Amino acid sequence: MLEQLQTLKNEAETQINEASDLKTLNDLRVKYLGKKGPMTEIMKQMGKLSAEERPKMGSLANEVRTALTEAISSKQQILETEAINEKLKSETIDVTLPGTAPSIGTKHLLTQVIEEMEDMFIGMGYEIAEGPEVELDYYNFEALNLPKDHPARDMQDSFYITENTLLRTQTSPVQARTMEKHDFSKGPIKVICPGKVYRRDNDDATHSHQFTQIEGLVVGENITFADLKGTLTVLAKTMFGEEREIRLRPSFFPFTEPSVEMDISCFKCGGKGCRVCKGTGWIEILGSGMVHPNVLEMSGIDSTRYSGFAFGLGPERVAMLKYAVDDIRHLYTNDLRFTKQFQSTETGEI
């Protein structure tokens, strides 16, 4: 039995030392120290020994059991430490790697179009003029040759706040304010007026109660219709392509005389006629004309000495035509599926 205990101890310690994981180690514990293990069988055989041998062999058997228990416990600590270290190693975060960049917004399609036009006009020597969105009736209408009860006021159903104040229906009041305070000793007036405007329109695919306008104004000595045509030609070719042709049609606006509307040759069909141009080969873009003498005089400008031209267009219409947007409401519904299609490389201010 002594030899049996020593062989068992050596065999068990060897296998315990070679155990590579906790499951194997637990299997060895059950194998050698379990109820059906060899140590249990040896302890059962103690009763067959003589009274002299029994204490000695019992003490030796207990020493072997204690040694194996301690060996298993020691090996368990080693394997648990190795498992923890391996887990920490596999879950280590490399702080030198670049982090996940946050989602950064880019400029909205409408902002891109507005800034493209602003950059073009600034390059032509224009300045940007701004004014209040809550405007006096005088600047919104009367200073623009639209006196009270003028029938043309019916064309712009307005949001009145008080009897004499309203949400501006156009950015033309900025032109009136600019002319009123301008000092011609410092040069001619040459401004564009971008901004939000408001009209009591029913929202649909092509109309909105709030939209944007960019209006332009040039006033100085010897300003002619040819200057207006040249400016509109540059605008059309810059925004819609060098191959674009323009067409000017007579029209009526109370604040300009003569007044014209500008069409551009259809960029979809090349003038042959299609759904975009409604079969005409031309697409209406903006209204314009020479500043009416009455408007100049109401701003304190001598109409016999100074002349000028003005024009106005909607960036929404430009964006819809240029990027084939079929509903103006897409520009205002904040649907990321739509806006992500027109992401610019330049980030916006958030």
From Swiss-Prot:
Its EC number(s): 6.1.1.20
InterPro entries recorded: aa-tRNA-synth_II, aa-tRNA-synth_II/BPL/LPL, Phe-tRNA-synth_IIc_asu, Phe-tRNA_ligase_II_N, Phe_tRNA_ligase_alpha1_bac, Phenylalanyl-tRNA_Synthase, tRNA-bd_arm
Keyword terms of this UniProt record: Aminoacyl-tRNA synthetase, ATP-binding, Cytoplasm, Ligase, Magnesium, Metal-binding, Nucleotide-binding, Protein biosynthesis
Lineage top rank: taxon: Bacteria
Record note on cofactor: Binds 2 magnesium ions per tetramer.
Primary localisation category: cytoplasm
Entry protein name: Phenylalanine--tRNA ligase alpha subunit
Source organism: Listeria monocytogenes serotype 4b (strain F2365)
